UniProtKB/Swiss-Prot annotation:
Active site annotation, chain numbering: H96 (electrophile), E168 (proton acceptor)
Pathway: Carbohydrate biosynthesis; gluconeogenesis; Carbohydrate degradation; glycolysis; D-glyceraldehyde 3-phosphate from glycerone phosphate: step 1/1
Assembly notes: Homodimer.
One GO biological process term: gluconeogenesis
One Gene Ontology cellular component: cytosol
Classification via InterPro entries: Aldolase_TIM, TIM_sf, TrioseP_Isoase_bac/euk, Triosephosphate_isomerase, Triosephosphate_isomerase_AS
Protein's recorded name: Triosephosphate isomerase
Location in or out of the cell: Cytoplasm
Length: 250
């Protein structure tokens, strides 16, 4: 059975005081209402240490929004997986649309990061999705196929147990627009099909991997989305940054 995951992406939001206060509230409320769903939190890098310390010893996973695929080295402004491990970080998000769109992150660089992280026993949340222009020009499946085939190139079958995917239609992020359940299901089904075709024997992996939906997910639409066969949770932005709306996702 696939795991249901609710992943909160705080992006470059919240002051330190707000982040730590929210972490305390999450620690108090979420374990009691999680109902078997896995909770992940992705604070900004500056707040990782404080949030991880608060949530230490709970089942809530603290993740990083980005990483550089290297050990300790001279890469100014970057963060090494080795440093993240010291903080108790177990999950790293790779390929978020904002990093692709604004920071030029490519499928091949995502692939390099994913290989490095899996080799070092991290869980990877890999994001894929199309822009509004790509959807309107009929390129949704072409774009996502490239992101999957190039981003997951060379990943060994045994490593997929530490891999989660998220479909985030860029046109539905922070816009208030949400893909209809049918639209989301269509793409999630396609993602499973693409994973099944990566290598011989990948069909079973495709059926077992969790695929989250990200795009203006809120308490009032998540249950409808999760009724779809191939949707296994949410990658949530704004609604994860307040305790009432985050708790409402469970």
């Amino acid at each position: 059975m696939r795991k249901t995951v609710i992943a909160g992406n705080w992006k470059m939001n919240l002051s330190e005081k707000e982040a730590l206060s929210l972490a305390h509230s999450i620690k108090e409320k979420i374990p009691a209402i999680s109902k078997g769903r896995i909770s992940m939190i992705f604070p900004s890098t500056l707040h990782l240490a404080g949030v991880a310390k608060i949530l230490q010893g709970t089942e809530i996973l603290v993740g990083a929004q980005n990483v550089y695929p290297s050990g300790l080295a001279a890469f100014t402004g970057e963060t090494s997986p080795e440093q993240l491990k010291e903080l108790g970080v177990k999950v790293v998000m790779i390929g978020h649309s904002e990093r692709r769109q604004f920071l030029g992150e490519t499928n091949s660089f995502c692939n390099e990061k994913i290989h490095f992280l899996l080799k070092n026993d991290f869980i990877v949340l890999y994001c894929v999705g199309e822009t509004l222009m790509e959807r309107e020009s009929g390129k949704t499946f072409e774009v996502i196929s490239s992101q999957i085939r190039e981003g997951l190139k060379g990943i060994h079958s045994h490593s997929f147990s530490n891999l989660i995917l998220a479909y985030e239609p860029v046109w539905a992020i922070g816009t208030g627009k949400v893909a209809t359940p049918a639209q989301a299901q269509e793409v999630h089904f396609f993602i499973r099909k693409e994973i099944a075709g990566l290598f011989l024997g990948a069909k079973e992996i495709a059926e077992s991997i969790s695929i989250l939906y990200g795009g203006s997910v809120k308490p009032d639409n998540i249950q409808t989305l999760l009724k779809e066969k191939d949707l296994d949770g949410g990658l949530v932005g704004g609604a994860s940054q307040k305790i009432d709306t985050y708790a409402g996702l469970f």
